[in-house]
Amino acid sequence: MIKRNLNDLLSFVAVAREGTFTRAAAQLGVTQSALSQSISGLEARLQIRLLTRTTRSVSPTAAGERLLNAIGNRFDEIEAELDELSALRDKPSGTVRITCGDHIQRTLLLPRLTPLLLEYPDIKVEFDINYGFRDIVADRFDAGVRLGDTIDKDMIAVPIGPPVRMAVVAAPAYFAAHPKPRSPRDLVDHNCINMRMQSGGGLYAWDFQRKDRHVNVRVDGQLIFNTSPNIVDAALAGLGIAWLPEEEFAPHIEEGRLLRVLENWCPLFPGYYLYYPNRRQPSPAFSLVVDALRYTRPRGTTIGGG
């Protein structure tokens, strides 16, 4: 009886968190029908409905939410303990989940982790591409990647890249039809390409600094994206002015396909950091990932210059 209840409770947690029987069944490695029977059996024994089912999704009822809050974290703790036990084997193993943007994943994380993954075949890395401010604890990520000045103070932050500079660019065709902005405030008169935060839903404000002067501009335009490659493509097509870390525009600036403006309003600032909660016993796999990504600034350099 106890074993059956534990299996059914695990099934319930998976469905409640995933929001669909399809994803939950795939996660648990069972059929959807078996999963549905498990949930129905649990509800029958408890004599209370735990899930509300629609044609598109599944969500916990008030009773289901209460049960999920009571047991969900306990299953996570059990899984974490089992992962630590598996780490006692000769080779580090386990899955490391990281949330980050797609550009930094393609250009920095994957190249740095490639030698590690080839050397340790039992280590898995799962990337969640997201530009929002994810709660890595609530969403059960091992770590996230953000620019250094946006990380909460209670997190451990490990530098994984050099200081960065933002860039304001547009295609030559755009500037042929519109005057170049001379100050950040001029951007309000331009067609700017916006990015929407995936977590909060708001638009990113464009932030500028010149010596001790800070300017924060809420721009407007015809296009809004939630990933940076789309913004680069739109700028190349002449559809407006874009604002991103300069490395995302670098090859196009060098080739003359994008022109840069307001350069003296875009100083260097702390670059990308891997951040994670202060944990007592990181797994060997996670420690290896952190070491592989860690950036060491060349001696004699500072954020303000080389």
UniProtKB/Swiss-Prot annotation:
Which GO terms of type biological process are on file? Answer: DNA-templated transcription
InterPro entries in UniProt: LysR_subst-bd (IPR005119), Tscrpt_reg_HTH_LysR (IPR000847), WH-like_DNA-bd_sf (IPR036388), WH_DNA-bd_sf (IPR036390)
Q: Where is the HTH lysR-type domain?
A: 1-61
Kindly give the SUPFAM superfamilies that the UniProt entry links to this protein. Periplasmic binding protein-like II (SSF53850), Winged helix' DNA-binding domain (SSF46785)
State a single Pfam family of this protein.
HTH_1
Q: Does the keyword Oxidoreductase apply?
A: no
* Top-level division of the source organism's lineage: Bacteria
Q: Which CDD domains match?
A: PBP2_CrgA_like_5 (cd08474)
Sorted alphabetically, the keyword list is: DNA-binding, Transcription, Transcription regulation
User: One GO molecular function term?
Assistant: sequence-specific DNA binding
Residue ranges the UniProt entry marks as DNA-binding:
21-40
Indicate the family of this protein: Belongs to the LysR transcriptional regulatory family.
Q: What functional role does this protein have? A: May have a role in the regulation of oprD expression.
- Please give the name of this protein: Putative transcriptional regulator
Species source reads Pseudomonas aeruginosa (strain ATCC 15692 / DSM 22644 / CIP 104116 / JCM 14847 / LMG 12228 / 1C / PRS 101 / PAO1)
